[in-house]
């Protein structure tokens, strides 16, 4: 089965093609540039570029639209304008080709695709992106939300600090590079509530003291404290749920320092940690295509329509 996947939840419009026998055949995308996300401007970019991205993916896979058996689209959670456009495109293609169309959950796609790539059995998923920071697991065949941020996502925190330091967008890679030159670990406040966390206090504190320290030390301290906080919760959750495998997903999971710290934590606890390629951690169409295939083969179906606040876990 060949599945075409459309990612359209936020700044990225992606088209991926997944073959049930050969794996990922193509994974093409275009990303909205600029600080923050302006939903309508992002949707305009998607509208302008979708046909080019689609054709590029088909060329990479060396197939035509007629070879597609199923269309999957990210139906949420995400920004309503981009979700509307992406789901409209998917439904239009389905009608034109007379092929079934399935809506899939963006966050579940990140995690199920990561599990597929890692060949993991029963991991704890740490999903770290711009808007989200969540600790997820599969318990009794259902998605279980172990813990999450109670205010802002770690990616948003990093981007906000980067902007306040005068760094260009995207902020994550810039902070990561600056952090390598930092030497002074600044003590930052943080809040853990059970297996939940709050990051707003760190941002407020950095805004107050940013002129007292070098950009390098602020970047270094931000990464060390925030990543340690995330992995502390992950470690506790893994012991609580008796999980032996750890996977980082989402765009922030591209950060090498976070991966190094996760690897060290896993080693100390005799856990298995899976380090995945960055191209499949950021938003992409391949993960949507894969989850579409996986759900469809399991008899799971959701209508392709925008669901900006879609949560399907317990």
Curated annotation (Swiss-Prot):
Tell me, what is one Gene Ontology molecular-function annotation carried by this entry? iron ion binding
Set out the biological process GO terms recorded for this chain's protein: tRNA threonylcarbamoyladenosine modification
SUPFAM superfamilies in the record: Actin-like ATPase domain
Q: Name one Pfam family in it.
A: TsaD
What's the Enzyme Commission number for this chain? 2.3.1.234
UniProt-annotated location(s) = Cytoplasm
Q: What Gene3D superfamilies does this protein's entry cite?
A: 3.30.420.40
Give the residues the record marks as binding Fe cation: 106, 110, 127, 283
Which keywords are on file for this protein?
Answer: Acyltransferase, Cytoplasm, Iron, Metal-binding, Transferase, tRNA processing
Record's cofactor remark: Binds 1 Fe(2+) ion per subunit.
InterPro entries registered for this protein in UniProt: ATPase_NBD, Gcp-like_dom, KAE1/TsaD, Kae1_archaea_euk
Q: Which GO terms describe its cellular component?
A: cytoplasm; EKC/KEOPS complex
Name the residues that span the membrane.
Answer: none
Q: Which cofactor does it need?
A: Fe(2+)
Where on the tree of life does the source sit, at the highest rank?
A: Archaea
Residues recorded as binding substrate, renumbered to this chain, are: 127-131, 159, 172, 176, 255
Q: What is its main location?
A: cytoplasm
Q: Which reaction does it catalyse?
A: L-threonylcarbamoyladenylate + adenosine(37) in tRNA = N(6)-L-threonylcarbamoyladenosine(37) in tRNA + AMP + H(+)
Show the HAMAP family listed in the entry: Kae1
> What PANTHER family does this protein's entry cite?
TRNA N6-ADENOSINE THREONYLCARBAMOYLTRANSFERASE
Recorded family membership = Belongs to the KAE1 / TsaD family.
**Entry function:** Required for the formation of a threonylcarbamoyl group on adenosine at position 37 (t(6)A37) in tRNAs that read codons beginning with adenine. Is probably involved in the transfer of the threonylcarbamoyl moiety of threonylcarbamoyl-AMP (TC-AMP) to the N6 group of A37.
Protein name (record): tRNA N6-adenosine threonylcarbamoyltransferase
Record the organism: Nanoarchaeum equitans (strain Kin4-M)
The major lineage groups are:
Archaea, Nanobdellota, Candidatus Nanoarchaeia, Nanoarchaeales, Nanoarchaeaceae
């Amino acid at each position: 089965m060949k599945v075409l996947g459309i990612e359209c939840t936020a700044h990225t419009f992606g088209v991926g093609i997944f073959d049930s026998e050969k794996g990922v055949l193509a994974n093409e995308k275009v990303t909205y540039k600029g600080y923050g996300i302006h939903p309508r401007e992002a949707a305009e970019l998607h509208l302008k570029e979708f046909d080019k991205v689609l054709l590029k993916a088909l060329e990479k896979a060396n197939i035509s639209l007629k070879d597609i058996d199923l269309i999957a689209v990210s139906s949420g959670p995400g920004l309503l304008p981009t979700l509307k456009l992406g789901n409209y495109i998917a439904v239009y293609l389905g009608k034109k080709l007379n092929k079934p169309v399935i809506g899939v959950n963006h966050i579940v796609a990140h995690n199920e695709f990561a599990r597929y790539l890692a060949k993991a059995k029963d991991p704890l998923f740490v999903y770290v992106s711009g808007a989200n920071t969540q600790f997820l697991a599969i318990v009794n065949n259902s998605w279980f939300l172990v813990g999450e941020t109670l205010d802002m996502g770690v990616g948003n925190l990093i981007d906000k600090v980067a902007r306040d330091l005068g760094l260009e967008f995207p902020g994550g890679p810039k902070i990561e590079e600056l952090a390598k030159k930092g030497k002074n670990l600044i003590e930052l406040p943080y809040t853990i509530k059970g297996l939940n966390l709050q990051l707003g206090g760190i941002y407020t504190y950095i805004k107050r003291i940013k002129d007292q320290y070098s950009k390098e030390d602020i970047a270094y301290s931000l990464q060390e404290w925030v990543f340690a906080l995330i992995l502390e919760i992950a470690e506790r959750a893994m012991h609580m749920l008796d999980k032996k495998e750890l996977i980082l997903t989402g765009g922030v999971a591209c950060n090498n320092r976070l991966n190094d710290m996760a690897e060290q934590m896993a080693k100390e606890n005799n856990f298995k940690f899976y380090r995945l390629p960055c191209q499949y951690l950021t938003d992409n169409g391949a993960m949507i295509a894969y989850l579409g295939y996986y759900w469809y083969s399991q008899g799971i179906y959701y209508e392709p329509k925008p669901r900006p606040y879609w949560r399907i876990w317990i």
